[in-house]
Amino acid sequence: MVTQNKKILIITGSFGNGHLQVTQSVVNQFKEMNLDNLTVIEHDLFLEAHPILTSICKKWYINSFKYFRNMYKAFYYSQPDQLDKCFYKYYGLNKLMNLLLKEKPDLILLTFPTPVMSVLTEQFDMNIPIATVMTDYRMQKNWITPFSQRYYLATEELKDEFASIGIPKDKLKVTGIPISDKFETDIDKTAWLSQNHLDPDKPTILMSAGAFGVSKGFGQMIQEILNRSPHAQVVMICGKNKDLKRSLTSQFKDFNNVLILGYTKHMNEWMASSQLMITKPGGITISEALTRQIPMIFLDPAPGQELENAVYFEEKGYGRIANTPEAAIEQVAALTNAPTKLASMSESMDASRIPYSTYKLCKDLLNLLNHSSHYEEVYGKVPLYAKLFVK
């Protein structure tokens, strides 16, 4: 309950859709709570601060998974002191200062790694409560913000990792990664598959091709999966890759056990109705799959957060890593021909998932808000030279 007017500023980023999805889940949850005294605003800090440079960086980021893996690996695994000397630490400083002094939020929620926040907390003594939502399953130094009052984490293991570098445990909350509440609702799998002209009695393999950013090789992969698992059916989600959808639709037009889709708003229904999923191990996608208890095969995860997520899920028994399409086909055949193994993996996921993670996170944020200082006590401390940043 918010008894006086309060404002939350969410800092997000559009490097991949996951951070935006987390932000939207939090915003929607607060709307459902119907809190008259709460204002929630969101800003893509880097895009707003440096639109052209950010656009270039985003293209590099996307292509790094395909062409510059070693470069991205070096950045991801670089030491904290190396990052501290990097310009990236100051990226967006002017825009952030403008936002804070104009909007005067009572709490800042980071859904994207924002190293520049440490510049404000360390140098400008702006005592605003800061909370961080980590959207992956292994610790990474970019998420560490000095003086952050709360870190919302996916697992107890991740909590132990944060505690091992000296972050007090009372600042660490295991809420799970925020996802839409629709992944908690019951789905009639038989009805869903039937209305999409698929057989409810066949094991359904869900492939999310849009996550890979490439168009080649999927036709052969689907054909080999069907050859090795003739009792199964395949649903291929092509995302916004229209060329891939057109090509695969033509190739499999006479197959009643293959469904080719483009962009869909029904990943929830497809996850709920499938027995196995081939995907990239993005933090949000695998959190949704964990909630839906659908085991996964991670095809060629890139070094960095993808690989770390995949290794964690494989260690827990929720999925398997396949570094090549051939290995993925072998894994699909092995699992679809061993339904008890698939069922065991699904049961492990059900026992480990954290339901209603977004609601739990938002309830804790409200608790932080109710104990935050009045904005005049916070922003009155800002030195004059800092206020000169404001335009």
From Swiss-Prot:
One GO-annotated biological process of the protein: lipoteichoic acid biosynthetic process
Pfam families: Glyco_tran_28_C (PF04101), MGDG_synth (PF06925)
Subcellular location: Cell membrane
Reactions catalysed according to its record: a 1,2-diacyl-3-O-(beta-D-glucopyranosyl)-sn-glycerol + UDP-alpha-D-glucose = a 1,2-diacyl-3-O-(beta-D-Glc-(1->6)-beta-D-Glc)-sn-glycerol + UDP + H(+); a 1,2-diacyl-sn-glycerol + UDP-alpha-D-glucose = a 1,2-diacyl-3-O-(beta-D-glucopyranosyl)-sn-glycerol + UDP + H(+)
Sorted UniProt keywords: Carbohydrate metabolism, Cell membrane, Glycosyltransferase, Lipid biosynthesis, Lipid metabolism, Membrane, Transferase
Keyword Ubl conjugation set for record: no
Family annotation (InterPro entries): Diacylglyc_glucosyltr_N, Glyco_trans_28_C, Glycosyltransf_28_UgtP, Pro_diacylglycrl_glcsylTrfase
Top-level lineage group: Bacteria
HAMAP family xref list: Diacylglyc_glucosyltr
Protein name in UniProt: Processive diacylglycerol beta-glucosyltransferase
Species of provenance: Staphylococcus saprophyticus subsp. saprophyticus (strain ATCC 15305 / DSM 20229 / NCIMB 8711 / NCTC 7292 / S-41)
